[in-house]
């Protein structure tokens, strides 16, 4: 808050004990004055299966449909252009772990998804366009915990995934099934969102501190300079769009959707556009997907109502809403 970067503590459970005090209320009022609510999104889809607890969303350009992963049901559903929802990978078919990030292979349209449970067991799974399992890959390095979270797929089919529990980024060698750690110049703190630029070389990894850029050609890395009065921290979802990074920031107090325009070399933020802030669509967003110039995102993941494999309060469950906002 002292850095004046837009952090709104009213949405963070860490500050529950301070709510209602004059000092806290004054701080919140200052933040909200300088970083006002922005409402540009609209409702796109609703899924009536209230206990999905969705975390991953991906768009299939060829079939014009979305894939939505479920933490609670441990399955993947698809949503067609008319908003009809059906199972893509039904629960219990392949004994999946809770489903997180989902991305498509740009070459063949197959679907990759990360799965992991809080205890530290994780798998990267691969499906064809009909939902048939093509492969499943788990780390075999003996580490106590792994948690594959989000991922990208390169033009050659290589998969790169964040590991939130091991604080690393891994590349999958599809021939051997081994995961190779990507060298990063600093320690990562709960790496989560990940995006790949159109050059198929510049990789952006979001963690609790900010965004790290990795050059996949020479493995050099550096922090993306957020610029003054801005934070790139805590992006759950991160996506590349026309020289900008689209971020779902849900770990910085009150969540927001933001677009970070980058310099030509991709090393610094030159302009920040807050797309949605403190509205009904930023209750607890997690990830999203880009279709054309529109960004679709999970508006109310309800992830805070899930403890391990259990819904804490079923009376609080609501229909899952997917919102959409126009990109700059």
Language model features by range: what are they?
Residues 114-121, 300-319:
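Short, conserved, GDST-rich strand-edge loop motifs in beta-rich repeat architectures
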Residues 40-48, 84-94, 132-141, 178-185, ...:
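A short beta-strand motif characteristic of beta-propeller blades
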Residues 35-77, 317-321:
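Beta-strand-rich domains and repeat architectures in extracellular enzymes and scaffolds
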